[in-house]
């Protein structure tokens, strides 16, 4: 995906990028400093959440948030991230109830990546994969169900 100059100066995207970068830095600090691991994970989570809030269309923001939850051992938080992503993608979050027996700490990041591969948040990537008329009809029906 190419960034245009308009993307670089979009205030919400810039804030999302800044918070994501901070979250990644705190994740690295959590790995490097076991004594302050929990504190750094909390800061990483706070920044990762802010990144998603400022720009929920950036797949990296979702990936970093899921990684923070996984490293923190928060299976319930991972499920909540997936539910939120499913809502953003126009999917029924109740579909996750089929996965109640699955260990979210092991599978959530893979599920998140699979969901983003099936329904990219980038509009151009989505159009390339779903631009056919029958796909658009399915998408339209899915949106009306929400």
Stretches with model-predicted labels:
Residues 16, 59-60:
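Helix-start (N-cap) detector for alpha-helical repeat units in TPR-like alpha-solenoids
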Residues 1-38, 80-146:
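Intrinsically disordered, low-complexity, charge-biased linker/tail regions
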């Amino acid at each position: 995906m190419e960034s245009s100059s308009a993307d670089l100066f979009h205030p919400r995207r810039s804030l999302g990028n800044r918070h994501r970068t901070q979250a990644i830095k705190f994740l690295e600090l959590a790995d490097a400093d076991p004594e302050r691991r929990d504190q750094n994970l909390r800061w990483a989570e706070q920044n990762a959440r802010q990144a998603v809030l400022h720009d929920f269309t950036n797949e990296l923001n979702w990936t970093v948030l899921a990684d923070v939850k996984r490293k923190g051992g928060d299976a319930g938080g991972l499920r909540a991230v997936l539910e939120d992503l499913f809502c953003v993608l126009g999917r029924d979050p109740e579909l996750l109830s089929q996965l109640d027996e699955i260990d979210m700490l092991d599978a959530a990041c893979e599920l998140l990546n699979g969901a983003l591969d099936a329904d990219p948040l980038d509009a151009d990537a989505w159009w390339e994969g779903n631009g056919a008329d029958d796909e658009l009809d399915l998408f339209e029906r899915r949106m009306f169900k929400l």
